[in-house]
Structures are given as C-alpha cells and as structure tokens.
Amino acid sequence: MEPEIKIVNVVVSTQIGTDIDLEYAADILDNAEYEPEQFPGLVCRLSDPKVALLIFRSGKLNCTGAKSKDDAVIAINKIIKELQEAGMDIIDNPEVNVQNMVATTELGMEPNLDDISTLECTEYEPEQFPGLVYRLSDPKVVVLIFGSGKVVITGLKRIDDAYVAFNKILTTLKELEEELY
C-alpha cells in the first residue's frame, strides 16, 4: 500500500530577465514589504495561492510556501503581470526551478528512536530536538522521524523521491526490528 505523502512546502526560484527597482516595485505591488536595512529583497505575500515571494534587485525571484510547483508558477506569473502592467520590461513565463520540497507522512506506528539512532547516518539528541535526523544519500534528502510516528522529508526535488525515501526508511526499520527483537 502506498503511503499518503503530503507536500507541505515547495520552494522555487526563477530569473525574470531584468534588474528590478525594488523601491518602485514595493509601491506598486499589493502586500509588499521592502526594508533594505533588514533584508536585501522585497517580500510580497499573496493569499491565493498562499505564498511569499522574495524579489531581488538582480531580477532573481524565490517563491516559498506553495503546496505545488504549479501554485508557485501561478504566483510568479501574477507578480510578473503586475510588474509588466506598471511598465517594467519583464520576460513572460520564465523557467522555474524547484529548489526544495517538504513532505509529511506517517509511519503508522510509534518508533523507538533510541534504537533507530544506532543506524549510520542518523542523529538523535532529544534534549536539543525531539526528532531523529536521518540523512539519506539516494535520494539526497533529510528525513525527520518523531516518536509519534510523524515523518517529515525535506530536500526533495521531485515528489517521487519522497516515496523512494519513505520506502527505504520502512525497509530499514523492518530490518532493524528483525535484528533487535
């Protein structure tokens, strides 16, 4: 049975083809904040889709908080349209690259994190962080496993990698259980 894996955050980046006057952009974009003494980029928050866009003077744009790459592209295109309507010369449909995805799922059991921490590529310091950190090399992701059975997978570039990583973890946990009990 396939696990139910939910994408909870997608971070993408793009280059919109020209330098941006951030002071001007902050004036014309709704929900934009530009405080260069605190952060070098303009922060623009949209409600539909619910994302935050970081726009930099160089024309680099990052979108975070999306639930899918498609939502991120929709948000980027909304901002591009607003900037174009204000007279800025910006390319249509720039290439959008996924930088990171975060997914969540459940193990369906309450794991013994102390036992799992004996495996290579794991870190578990419950005084500092309640989850066990498990670093996989293929796919290159970080899996956080909590005592409740909740699992967070970060560092994803593709949704398929979440399933591969989760199935590797399940296989490893079954092998560990057979060894220990």
Curated annotation (Swiss-Prot):
InterPro entries: TBP, TBP_archaea, TBP_CS, TBP_dom_sf
UniProt-listed Pfam families: TBP
Extent of the Sequence repeats: 7-83, 98-173
Keywords noted in UniProt: DNA-binding, Repeat, Transcription, Transcription regulation
Domain of life: Archaea
Gene3D superfamilies: TATA-Binding Protein (3.30.310.10)
GO terms of molecular function: DNA binding; DNA-binding transcription factor activity
Single biological process term from Gene Ontology: DNA-templated transcription initiation
Role according to the record: General factor that plays a role in the activation of archaeal genes transcribed by RNA polymerase. Binds specifically to the TATA box promoter element which lies close to the position of transcription initiation.
Family statement: Belongs to the TBP family.
Name of the protein: TATA-box-binding protein
